[in-house]
Amino acid sequence: MPPYTVVYFPVRGRCAALRMLLADQGQSWKEEVVTMETWQEGSLKASCLYGQLPKFQDGDLTLYQSNTFLRHLGRTLGLYGKDQREAALVDMVNDGVEDLRCKYLSLIYTNYEAGKDDYVKALPGQLKPFETLLSQNQGGKTFIVGDQISFADYNLLDLLLIHEVLAPGCLDAFPLLSAYVARLSARPKLKAFLASPEHVNLPINGNGKQ
């Protein structure tokens, strides 16, 4: 039985980066899909620490909060930089990803029709820091931090992919980010996962937007 279990709704949502990481690292995991009917019944929600999903199980360790999953696997699988300096930079990148993801989710779930145009107009300013970070690391030819992949790379990749769906061409002005997405997406195990029905057939969000 796989040591890892993902408990979540039938969406990519806040587990897409986690699944990318697991797939790319050659890990197996079990999915426990929660329907809205089951969730609205209430007993599962009441059992969750913060009253929300996703939930992640690593053996007898139960975790909540999607970024906690990534950091845990970063430590477990050696995806947290090669030293404390790189680990600090990985944390900084991941926090920046979370900031933009929260803005994206606010748009998707609360203001999509009225707010999309303004969001897309402001998007270059939100993406520029990641282009800058790439430019400062070996000319943008490797990863977002250092010379080995980290959990922040998977989170950033997912963020960029969903924004390419929201605003096609949004990376055209960012050559390093564009090349980064292409390079990471071409990693054999990750490429196979991104093309798999398990990924492709899931909506990005739970409300029909994207």
Swiss-Prot record:
<dbReference type="InterPro" id="IPR040079">
    <property type="entry name" value="Glutathione_S-Trfase"/>
</dbReference>
<feature type="domain" description="GST N-terminal">
    <location>
        <begin position="2"/>
        <end position="81"/>
    </location>
</feature>
<keyword id="KW-0808">Transferase</keyword>
<keyword id="KW-0007">Acetylation</keyword>
<dbReference type="InterPro" id="IPR003082">
    <property type="entry name" value="GST_pi"/>
</dbReference>
<dbReference type="GO" id="GO:0051122">
    <property type="term" value="P:hepoxilin biosynthetic process"/>
</dbReference>
<keyword id="KW-0443">Lipid metabolism</keyword>
<dbReference type="InterPro" id="IPR004045">
    <property type="entry name" value="Glutathione_S-Trfase_N"/>
</dbReference>
<keyword id="KW-0496">Mitochondrion</keyword>
<dbReference type="GO" id="GO:0004364">
    <property type="term" value="F:glutathione transferase activity"/>
</dbReference>
<comment type="subunit">
    <text>Homodimer. Interacts with CDK5.</text>
</comment>
<keyword id="KW-0963">Cytoplasm</keyword>
<dbReference type="InterPro" id="IPR036282">
    <property type="entry name" value="Glutathione-S-Trfase_C_sf"/>
</dbReference>
<dbReference type="GO" id="GO:0005739">
    <property type="term" value="C:mitochondrion"/>
</dbReference>
<dbReference type="GO" id="GO:0005829">
    <property type="term" value="C:cytosol"/>
</dbReference>
<feature type="binding site">
    <location>
        <position position="45"/>
    </location>
    <ligand>
        <name>glutathione</name>
    </ligand>
</feature>
<keyword id="KW-0539">Nucleus</keyword>
<feature type="binding site">
    <location>
        <position position="8"/>
    </location>
    <ligand>
        <name>glutathione</name>
    </ligand>
</feature>
<dbReference type="InterPro" id="IPR010987">
    <property type="entry name" value="Glutathione-S-Trfase_C-like"/>
</dbReference>
<feature type="binding site">
    <location>
        <begin position="65"/>
        <end position="66"/>
    </location>
    <ligand>
        <name>glutathione</name>
    </ligand>
</feature>
<comment type="function">
    <text>Conjugation of reduced glutathione to a wide number of exogenous and endogenous hydrophobic electrophiles. Involved in the formation of glutathione conjugates of both prostaglandin A2 (PGA2) and prostaglandin J2 (PGJ2). Participates in the formation of novel hepoxilin regioisomers. Negatively regulates CDK5 activity via p25/p35 translocation to prevent neurodegeneration.</text>
</comment>
<feature type="modified residue" description="N6-succinyllysine">
    <location>
        <position position="116"/>
    </location>
</feature>
<feature type="domain" description="GST C-terminal">
    <location>
        <begin position="83"/>
        <end position="204"/>
    </location>
</feature>
<dbReference type="Pfam" id="PF02798">
    <property type="entry name" value="GST_N"/>
</dbReference>
<dbReference type="GO" id="GO:0005634">
    <property type="term" value="C:nucleus"/>
</dbReference>
<feature type="modified residue" description="N6-acetyllysine">
    <location>
        <position position="128"/>
    </location>
</feature>
<feature type="modified residue" description="Phosphothreonine">
    <location>
        <position position="62"/>
    </location>
</feature>
<dbReference type="InterPro" id="IPR036249">
    <property type="entry name" value="Thioredoxin-like_sf"/>
</dbReference>
<dbReference type="GO" id="GO:0006749">
    <property type="term" value="P:glutathione metabolic process"/>
</dbReference>
<comment type="similarity">
    <text>Belongs to the GST superfamily. Pi family.</text>
</comment>
<dbReference type="GO" id="GO:0006693">
    <property type="term" value="P:prostaglandin metabolic process"/>
</dbReference>
<feature type="modified residue" description="N6-succinyllysine">
    <location>
        <position position="103"/>
    </location>
</feature>
<feature type="binding site">
    <location>
        <position position="14"/>
    </location>
    <ligand>
        <name>glutathione</name>
    </ligand>
</feature>
<protein>
    <recommendedName>
        <fullName>Glutathione S-transferase P</fullName>
        <ecNumber>2.5.1.18</ecNumber>
    </recommendedName>
</protein>
<keyword id="KW-0597">Phosphoprotein</keyword>
<dbReference type="Pfam" id="PF14497">
    <property type="entry name" value="GST_C_3"/>
</dbReference>
<dbReference type="GO" id="GO:1901687">
    <property type="term" value="P:glutathione derivative biosynthetic process"/>
</dbReference>
<feature type="modified residue" description="Phosphotyrosine; by EGFR">
    <location>
        <position position="4"/>
    </location>
</feature>
<feature type="binding site">
    <location>
        <begin position="52"/>
        <end position="53"/>
    </location>
    <ligand>
        <name>glutathione</name>
    </ligand>
</feature>
<feature type="binding site">
    <location>
        <position position="39"/>
    </location>
    <ligand>
        <name>glutathione</name>
    </ligand>
</feature>
<dbReference type="GO" id="GO:0006805">
    <property type="term" value="P:xenobiotic metabolic process"/>
</dbReference>
<dbReference type="InterPro" id="IPR004046">
    <property type="entry name" value="GST_C"/>
</dbReference>
